[in-house]
UniProtKB/Swiss-Prot annotation:
Cellular component annotations (GO), alphabetically ordered: cytosolic small ribosomal subunit
Functional description taken from the UniProt entry: With S4 and S12 plays an important role in translational accuracy.
Gene this protein is translated from: rps5
Highest taxon, organism lineage: Archaea
GO biological process, alphabetically ordered: translation
Protein's name in the database: Small ribosomal subunit protein uS5
GO molecular function: rRNA binding; structural constituent of ribosome
UniProt note: domains: The N-terminal domain interacts with the head of the 30S subunit; the C-terminal domain interacts with the body and contacts protein S4. The interaction surface between S4 and S5 is involved in control of translational fidelity.
Protein source organism: Methanococcus vannielii (strain ATCC 35089 / DSM 1224 / JCM 13029 / OCM 148 / SB)
Length: 225
């Protein structure tokens, strides 16, 4: 189950009362770029910060399931939603939310996905291409979550996203247009599959590159446009 949410209304900044110092700085206009928050390692504790700094963020519901747990009074059922958010231009996040109703579960998952937002490195790391434009990923990356392992490989321009529907949704909203993927484990667990793909994208940020290597790979972080 993967469906895009209806176009949301523009966020009203006037009705927002920030609870953190970063939130107050964003509302005052002191911080106007989300990359500044990430580069400085400032805590991102309010989803409204993302609403203000990334108004073009898109949301996609990957899965909604009814889960149960045993209690002394009997079985208790709740809905679990998995959501991915991204602007298709270098920023992506994955979140999960639980509630007794579907709507609140999805809203919790969206808020959690916004708080987990990361910058994505894009480039052209395929030896078959070498165009130097940011259409793929700059190098191979691996990610894990539970039993699921995902390996992302750079692909030449025009190949598209060779991946399962969940990984394709995460990569697409991150701004990656061409990539090969290899998966291991129980990929039927939607959240683990999405989180493993997200972890692989995040691991791209920990690879050190020389300036000449960055130029050759066309490596770009965050916004491309």
């Amino acid at each position: 189950m993967a469906e895009k949410r209806a176009e949301k209304r523009k966020f009203n900044t006037d009705s927002w009362e920030p609870k953190t110092q970063v939130g107050r700085m964003v509302k005052e206009g002191t911080i106007s770029d989300i990359s500044y928050i990430m580069d400085k390692g400032l805590p991102l504790l309010e989803p409204e910060i993302v609403d203000v700094l990334l108004p073009d963020l898109e949301e996609q519901v990957l899965d909604v399931k009814l889960v149960q747990r045993m209690h002394k009074s009997g079985r208790r059922a709740r809905y679990r939603a998995t959501v991915v958010v991204g602007n298709k231009n270098g920023y992506v996040g994955v979140g999960m939310g639980k509630s007794k109703e579907v709507g609140p579960a999805i809203r919790k998952a969206i808020a959690q996905a916004k708080l987990s937002l990361i910058k994505v490195r894009v480039g052209c790391g395929s030896w078959e291409c070498g165009c130097g434009s940011p259409h793929s990923i700059p190098f191979t990356a691996k990610g894990t979550c539970g039993s699921v392992k995902v390996e992302l490989l750079p692909a030449p321009r025009g190949v598209g996203l060779v991946a399962g529907n969940v990984a394709k949704a995460v990569l697409g909203l991150a701004g990656v247009k061409d990539a090969w993927t290899t998966t291991y484990g129980d990929t039927r667990t939607t959240y683990n599959f999405a989180e493993a793909t997200f972890d692989a994208l995040n691991n791209l940020n920990f690879v050190r590159c020389l300036p000449e290597q960055k130029a050759k790979l066309g490596l770009t972080e965050g916004r491309v446009l």
